[in-house]
Structure formats: C-alpha cells, structure tokens
Amino acid sequence: PLGIYKRAKAVYSKIEKSLLSEHKGKIIAVEPISGDYIIGSDEVEVAIEGKRRHPGRKFGLFRIGTSVVHKLRRDW
C-alpha cells in the first residue's frame, strides 16, 4: 500500500501545478499504474468513477492544492 501511495504521489506531483487554477480544493484520485486520474468534488464521486474505469485497482487520493485530504478535529 505504501508503494501505491508513493507511485500515485509521483504522478500527482507532475500534474499538480497544471490543475491548481481550475481545480484547487477538489479531490483527485490517481491510479498509479496507468497514471489515469479522476477529479471530483468528494471522495465518493472519484471512488465510483475510479472503480468503473479501473475495477480492482487501488488509488491515491489527494486534495488539489493542499497537503491533506481531511483534517481531523476533536470537538468533544
């Protein structure tokens, strides 16, 4: 799994700057073997499309223009 993340991150790093102006804040799912990627408004949207395009494959998920997909908070 870490190898999948590293390969997906390498693909994402190559295309991130070209996506920033139009897609900042959106979610991107990167399939590391093919280099294919899906951009959407949330994880569910990109997961459904990713499963349709590449059944059985794993993806790296990133939020375009940020270093994290989610920020966990403790409100209690």
Model features per residue range: what roles?
Residues 8-10, 16-18, 59, 71-76:
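Anionic, Ser/Thr-rich low-complexity intrinsically disordered regions
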Residues 32, 43, 64:
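Residues immediately flanking
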Residues 55-71:
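C-terminal structural segments of small proteins and small subunits
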Residues 1-8:
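Short, compositionally biased leader-like segments
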Residues 35-40:
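A short, exposed loop/beta-hairpin motif centered on an aromatic-Gly-Thr core
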Residues 42-57:
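A short, charged, amphipathic alpha-helix used as a generic interaction element across diverse proteins
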